[in-house]
């Protein structure tokens, strides 16, 4: 959920308090709290640094104006400082705009086939490969947690975990969620299916769900008594030996009916751990959506971005065109997009989101 605009004075006080707390050995006796405080401190640091630069530039401008009263050679310096102040003011305003607290997070992404039978499943697999290739371009790690394949090798459904930890690219500091949070919704494809003998273009669709993954499972309260855990024999593409033991795990959260399965890790314990992480992500998303609905039923969510029944994008193969209906984006490079070249589209979506946030300032 987007955070409200905050006063710079409040943030400066919080930053100073966190700096003192992080220097206190007592805080580090609770590693989880120490990590939480450290993440918040790191989040505030660039805001504080920009504010200090702005104050310094304003002081320099005042001095330059006083000196210019007796020496016209300072006029150029005044113009430079005024330009610098305008730039810093814009940066600080952007930083203080409502932001997404999950920006640095990794994600769990689900792809599900929809109407269209086998063609929809094949398209769902195309989407999964598109996201995997995009992640590879950025040095992110992708783990296929669960998958159900169709007769022709498509995906009836697949669950991916995408992590930026250890990545070396510059975008990684913002997290996977900040780049991929706009992907949730219905994706429509227009093309000639492999099963079409008459060469006619068909329309089908697949759904994508995206959840920010909590830094730690403990950040989301899950009562063990609310869980039913079943184990069974894996049936995915886990390689030789994957089917020989009951290593797959299915977890049902009884109060909500949410079911999570994981079968592609090498052991039952690993599958259970990953399934709990996915469950935590889903429950966190559900809680935030409910809180948002309670706060304002008619306000557009910047985290969920669209109703999941809404068509957000069309992939037109005959024209090699991709269209994002939310922002009116069109490009004739569908082949490149499906190969993971998504940055131009994601930049456009991020720019539209930024503009929306700035309007709330």
Swiss-Prot record:
The modification N5-methylglutamine is found at residue 240. GO terms for cellular component: cytoplasm. InterPro entries: PCRF, Pep_chain_release_fac_I, Pep_chain_release_fac_I_sf, Prokaryotic/Mito_RF, RF-1. Methylated by PrmC. Methylation increases the termination efficiency of RF1. It holds the Pfam family RF-1. It is found in: Cytoplasm. The keyword Protein biosynthesis applies. Keywords: Cytoplasm, Methylation, Protein biosynthesis. It comes from the Bacteria. One of its GO terms (molecular function) is translation release factor activity, codon specific. Disulfide bonds: none annotated. Peptide chain release factor 1 directs the termination of translation in response to the peptide chain termination codons UAG and UAA. PANTHER family: LD18447P (PTHR43804:SF7). Belongs to the prokaryotic/mitochondrial release factor family. This is Peptide chain release factor 1.
């Amino acid at each position: 959920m987007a955070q409200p605009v905050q006063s710079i004075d409040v943030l400066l006080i919080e930053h100073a308090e966190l700096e003192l707390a992080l220097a206190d050995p007592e805080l580090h006796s609770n590693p989880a709290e120490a990590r939480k405080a450290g993440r918040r401190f790191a989040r505030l640091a660039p805001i504080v640094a920009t504010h200090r630069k702005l104050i310094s530039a304003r002081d320099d401008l005042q001095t330059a104006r006083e000196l210019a009263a007796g020496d016209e050679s300072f006029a150029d310096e005044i113009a430079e400082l005024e330009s610098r102040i305008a730039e810093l003011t814009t940066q600080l305003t952007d930083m203080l705009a409502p932001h997404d607290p999950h920006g640095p997070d990794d994600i769990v992404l689900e792809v599900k086939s929809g109407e269209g039978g086998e063609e929809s499943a094949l398209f769902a697999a195309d989407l999964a490969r598109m996201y995997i290739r995009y992640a590879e371009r950025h040095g992110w790690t992708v783990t296929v947690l669960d998958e159900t394949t169709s007769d022709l090798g498509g995906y009836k459904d697949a669950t991916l975990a995408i992590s930026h930890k250890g990545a070396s690219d510059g975008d990684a500091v913002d997290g996977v969620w900040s780049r991929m949070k706009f992907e949730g919704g219905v994706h429509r494809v227009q093309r000639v299916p492999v099963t079409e003998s008459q060469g006619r273009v068909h329309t089908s669709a697949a759904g994508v769900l995206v959840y920010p993954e909590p830094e730690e499972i403990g950040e989301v309260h899950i009562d063990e008594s609310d869980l039913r855990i079943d184990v069974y024999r894996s049936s995915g593409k886990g390689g030789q030996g994957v089917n020989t033991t009951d290593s797959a795990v299915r977890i049902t959260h009884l109060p909500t009916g949410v079911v999570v399965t994981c079968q592609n890790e090498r052991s039952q314990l690993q599958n259970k751990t990953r399934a709990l992480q996915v469950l935590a992500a889903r429950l966190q998303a559900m809680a935030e959506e409910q809180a948002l609905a309670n706060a304002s039923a008619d306000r557009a969510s910047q985290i969920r971005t669209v109703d999941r029944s809404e068509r957000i994008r069309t992939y037109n193969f005959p024209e090699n065109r991709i269209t994002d209906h939310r922002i009116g984006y069109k490009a004739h490079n569908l082949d490149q997009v499906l190969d993971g070249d998504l940055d131009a589209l994601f930049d456009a979506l991020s720019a539209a989101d930024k503009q929306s946030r700035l309007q709330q300032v």
